[in-house]
């Protein structure tokens, strides 16, 4: 027989024995998305269990972190929803590519089967997962990047009430040794500039060393952004290669001809970089071969931040080098005739098309070899430019504007002490302690 119930005040929880022989609990959690009261129901054989569950719901409600109604989400479902429907609204292309790799290649295969509301209490699951990644041969930096992606994704789940706490913010991230950057010394810079100016687009690398432009910013420079009267250069865009997407209805079948079924042999000469792994059974990649491909190739995008949109005044010699380069490009344009693609790019292929970032990187490596200078990343040119500003004693505010930094804290990452500065300090100490009064 159903236990007689008295009407509780609005918002109060109710516990009663039903005709079905089960104890029932009903808790008002707030207002649902449809504007109606969000009333949760608990059903158990034992009254104490119902009392306990009702208490949990009440504490959840009172804390302000109410879980959404409906079937509990798995980690896979949430990560897929986040990376496909939430992150793209605010993230740039390269950031999204990193998120997609972390989610689809690592997080979903490793943790996707867990229930979202249960894994929140087990940060150790993530720590064990990172350890498995590293033990499988992946670099700690890769595991650390996956950790950062998971922290962001689960942080969004917390904000939206899917979980009551972010387990990834508690989990220990893999330790990553910070890569030591050695900017080029003055003598090396001079050798690099000399070797670069022997090549078609050599001024592009002089700009990188002198102004600290990022690779994409350098390749996206256009002639209309050069102010010849004021001798300034406006930096507002970046050039990047984006991945093509299938425009067809059956991506797997479309790319079937290019599916890799076996790993490369030990003495593989086909790939200049690391050999790619075999394709998964349901591979939907190889979109660049799709006749209806969309959204890929070289794309001009906005610079990374508002601070990145900047105007720099050119040193006289650099300005003259740019004008000389313009004349040489004009001769190339006349020689190419109708084959020339006029995109107003400052640095181009012989037919006027923009330069691919990979081709640009290969050119940089060749310049270093020709100059007899040690190996250095192309981005080290930006570190070198920032360090030169340090040596020259340029005020922090001016450095921020020239480099396109949004925060002065970037100075700690980009400015380095080079040998000439160390030697100067040693000379000063020598004079102070052992010099003649």
Swiss-Prot record:
Residues of the Core-binding (CB) domain: 73-158
Active site, per annotation: 214, 245, 379, 382, 405, 414 (o-(3'-phospho-dna)-tyrosine intermediate)
Keyword DNA-binding: yes
The organism's place on the tree of life at top rank: Bacteria
Gene3D superfamilies, A to Z: 1.10.150.130, Intergrase catalytic core
GO MF term (any one): DNA binding
Gene Ontology process terms (BP): DNA integration; DNA recombination; establishment of integrated proviral latency; symbiont entry into host cell; viral genome integration into host DNA
Coiled-coil regions listed in the entry: none
SUPFAM superfamilies: DNA breaking-rejoining enzymes
Disulfide bonds: none
One Pfam entry name: Phage_int_SAM_3
Keywords: DNA integration, DNA recombination, DNA-binding, Plasmid, Viral genome integration, Virus entry into host cell
Domain Tyr recombinase: 179-428
Family indicated by similarity: Belongs to the 'phage' integrase family.
Function: Is a recombinase (or integrase), catalyzing the cutting and rejoining of the recombining DNA molecules.
Name used for this protein in its record: Integrase
Organism whose genome encodes this protein: Saccharopolyspora erythraea
Gene designation per UniProt: int
């Amino acid at each position: 027989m159903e236990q007689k119930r008295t009407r509780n005040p609005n918002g109060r929880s109710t516990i009663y024995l039903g005709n079905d022989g089960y104890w029932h609990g009903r808790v008002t959690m707030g207002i649902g998305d449809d504007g109606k009261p969000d009333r949760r129901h608990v059903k158990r054989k034992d009254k104490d269990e119902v009392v306990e569950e009702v208490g949990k719901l009440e504490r959840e409600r009172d804390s302000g972190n109410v879980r959404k109604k409906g079937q509990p989400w798995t980690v896979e479902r949430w990560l897929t929803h986040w990376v496909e429907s939430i992150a793209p609204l605010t993230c740039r292309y390269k950031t999204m590519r990193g998120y997609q790799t972390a989610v689809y290649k690592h997080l979903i295969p490793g943790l996707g089967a867990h229930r979202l509301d249960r894994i929140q209490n087990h940060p150790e699951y993530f720590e064990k997962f990172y350890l498995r990644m590293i033990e499988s041969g992946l670099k700690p930096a890769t595991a650390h990047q996956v950790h950062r992606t998971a922290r962001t994704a689960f942080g969004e789940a917390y904000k939206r009430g899917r979980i009551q706490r972010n387990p990834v913010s508690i989990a220990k991230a893999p330790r990553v040794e910070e890569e030591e950057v050695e900017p080029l010394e003055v003598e090396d810079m001079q050798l690099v500039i000399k070797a670069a100016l022997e090549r078609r687009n050599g001024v592009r690398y002089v700009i990188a060393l002198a102004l600290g432009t990022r690779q994409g910013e350098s390749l996206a420079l256009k002639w209309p952004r050069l102010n010849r009267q004021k001798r300034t250069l406006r930096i507002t865009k970046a050039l990047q290669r984006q991945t093509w997407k299938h425009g067809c209805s059956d991506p797997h079948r479309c790319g079937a001809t290019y599916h890799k079924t076996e790993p490369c042999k030990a003495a593989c000469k086909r790939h200049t970089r690391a050999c790619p792994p075999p394709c998964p059974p349901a591979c939907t990649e190889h979109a660049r071969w799709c006749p209806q491909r969309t959204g890929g190739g070289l794309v001009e995008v906005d610079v990374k931040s508002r601070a990145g949109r900047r105007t720099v005044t050119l040193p006289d010699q650099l300005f003259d080098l740019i004008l000389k380069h313009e004349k040489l490009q004009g001769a190339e344009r006349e020689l190419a005739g109708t084959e020339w693609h006029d995109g107003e790019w400052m640095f181009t292929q012989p037919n006027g098309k923009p330069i691919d970032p990979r081709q640009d990187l290969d050119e940089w490596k060749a310049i270093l070899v020709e100059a007899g200078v040690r190996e250095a990343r192309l981005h080290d040119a930006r570190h070198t430019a920032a360090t030169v500003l340090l040596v020259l004693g340029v005020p922090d505010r001016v450095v921020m504007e020239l480099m396109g930094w949004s925060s002065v804290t970037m100075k700690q990452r980009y400015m380095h002490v080079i040998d000439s500065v160390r030697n100067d300090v040693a000379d000063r100490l020598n004079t102070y302690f052992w010099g003649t009064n």
